[in-house]
């Protein structure tokens, strides 16, 4: 099968300079590296093709031969002779993996402690007004017995001779460079003569920790509070992680919350709905009087401004929205039933019951039209 043009393989123009060729190669090599393609044979062949193209175009003499004779310059007995000798890919892969593996020099591994999560349930009143809650977490803490060194007091702690304190070692196979945890010190970068009996050489121990968490006013379900440095202890003296407290507000028996607004259902008698009156409704600040106008229907909303929640991100309080539910009387005695029948007979159609009259007139028209 005919070979592709090396310039096309790297995606560069024929007049590209050395920097452009190197940049193009690095980008493609990173994309098609076998560590990323996970055994895909087609992509492995693509990677070999990219390497072959770079080896030729990065070498001035080979590039000149290729520009003059094409692929024939490197065929057995061809004009250029010599085949492929293996270009110096070390600096290329050193650059590529430098950011991932900490640059070209070995450095001791510093691993920040894990972040932790704590789910905290609070009442609506606590969420609205703010509160302080005591919590207990399970965490990895600095070992007091060895002061975090991992070694028994008086025991020697030496730098690991395999990784020279880096905690990781590099392996080079041809022009491939890989990095892995040091097998001698298991990533700690040190050799301990006598490990601490409390932490078994880790420098950290599992323990329960008590904390007081200040909950600001206006929080809601899903809000997170970050307690900096209250997570797990880091390795080898690295910083602690953070603790994230996730708020969950319990359902309330009266109010429902939607952002800064509160909602509640207010039942009233059908006589009050018809005649009007005044009732007391609950708010988080106490009882407030609400005037019910005559002829109020079920579902009517009354907005009480400023009686909602002041959220953690706003200086303004939301509203309390009361939904009226007209309650039908139940368990009536015979006398009460007779009074209601008498009332029903006294009510005129459209003037006293406009919605009922309108509805049934509409139903009649519907069936009349259906029969035509």
Swiss-Prot record:
It comes from Pasteurella multocida (strain Pm70). A zinc finger (CR-type) spans 130-208. Its main location: cytoplasm. One of its GO terms (molecular function) is zinc ion binding. One of its GO terms (biological process) is chaperone cofactor-dependent protein refolding. InterPro entries: DnaJ, DnaJ_C, DnaJ_domain, DnaJ_domain_CS, HSP40/DnaJ_pept-bd, HSP_DnaJ_Cys-rich_dom, HSP_DnaJ_Cys-rich_dom_sf, J_dom_sf. Homodimer. Coiled coil: none annotated. PROSITE patterns: DNAJ_1, DNAJ_2, ZF_CR. NCBIfam families: DnaJ_bact, PRK10767.1. CXXCXGXG motif repeats lie at residues 143-150, 160-167, 182-189, 196-203. Zn(2+) 2 binds at residues 160, 163, 182, 185. Residues 5-70 form the J domain. Participates actively in the response to hyperosmotic and heat shock by preventing the aggregation of stress-denatured proteins and by disaggregating proteins, also in an autonomous, DnaK-independent fashion. Unfolded proteins bind initially to DnaJ; upon interaction with the DnaJ-bound protein, DnaK hydrolyzes its bound ATP, resulting in the formation of a stable complex. GrpE releases ADP from DnaK; ATP binding to DnaK triggers the release of the substrate protein, thus completing the reaction cycle. This is Chaperone protein DnaJ. Belongs to the DnaJ family. Keywords: Chaperone, Cytoplasm, DNA replication, Metal-binding, Repeat, Stress response, Zinc, Zinc-finger. GO terms for cellular component: cytoplasm. It is found in: Cytoplasm. Zn(2+) 1 binds at residues 143, 146, 196, 199. Its cofactor is Zn(2+). Binds 2 Zn(2+) ions per monomer. It holds the Pfam family DnaJ. The J domain is necessary and sufficient to stimulate DnaK ATPase activity. Zinc center 1 plays an important role in the autonomous, DnaK-independent chaperone activity of DnaJ. Zinc center 2 is essential for interaction with DnaK and for DnaJ activity.
């Amino acid at each position: 099968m005919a070979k592709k043009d090396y310039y096309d393989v790297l995606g560069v123009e024929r007049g590209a300079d050395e920097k452009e060729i190197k940049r193009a190669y690095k980008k493609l090599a990173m994309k098609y590296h076998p560590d990323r393609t996970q055994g895909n044979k087609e992509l492995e062949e693509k990677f070999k093709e990219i390497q072959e193209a770079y080896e030729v175009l990065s070498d001035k003499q080979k590039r000149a031969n290729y520009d003059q004779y094409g692929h024939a310059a490197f065929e057995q007995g061809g004009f250029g002779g010599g085949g492929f000798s293996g270009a110096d890919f070390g600096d290329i892969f050193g650059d590529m993996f430098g950011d991932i593996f900490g640059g070209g020099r070995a450095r001791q591994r510093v691993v920040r402690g894990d972040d932790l999560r704590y789910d905290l349930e609070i009442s609506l009143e606590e969420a609205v007004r703010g509160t302080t809650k005591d919590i207990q977490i399970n965490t990895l803490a600095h070992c007091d017995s060895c002061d975090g060194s991992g070694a028994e007091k008086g025991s020697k702690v030496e730098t690991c001779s395999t990784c020279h304190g880096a905690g990781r070692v590099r392996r080079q196979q041809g022009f491939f460079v890989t990095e892995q945890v040091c097998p001698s010190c298991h990533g700690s970068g040190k050799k301990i003569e006598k490990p601490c009996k409390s932490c078994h050489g880790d420098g950290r121990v599992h323990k329960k920790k008590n904390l007081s968490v200040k909950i600001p006013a206006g929080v809601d379900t899903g809000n997170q509070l970050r307690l900096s440095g209250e997570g797990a202890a880091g390795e080898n003296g690295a910083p602690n992680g953070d603790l994230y407290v996730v708020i969950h507000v319990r359902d309330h028996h009266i109010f429902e919350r939607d952002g800064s607004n509160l909602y509640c259902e207010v039942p009233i008698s059908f006589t009050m709905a018809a005649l009007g009156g005044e009732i007391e409704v609950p708010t988080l600040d106490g009882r407030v009087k609400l005037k019910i106008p005559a002829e109020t229907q079920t579902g009517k909303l009354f907005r009480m401004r400023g009686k909602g929640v002041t959220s953690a991100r706003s200086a303004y309080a939301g509203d309390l929205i009361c939904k009226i539910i007209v309650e039908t009387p139940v368990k009536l005695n015979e006398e009460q039933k007779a009074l209601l029948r008498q009332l029903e007979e006294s009510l005129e159609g459209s003037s006293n019951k406009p919605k009922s009259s309108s509805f049934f007139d509409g139903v009649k028209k519907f069936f009349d039209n259906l029969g035509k």
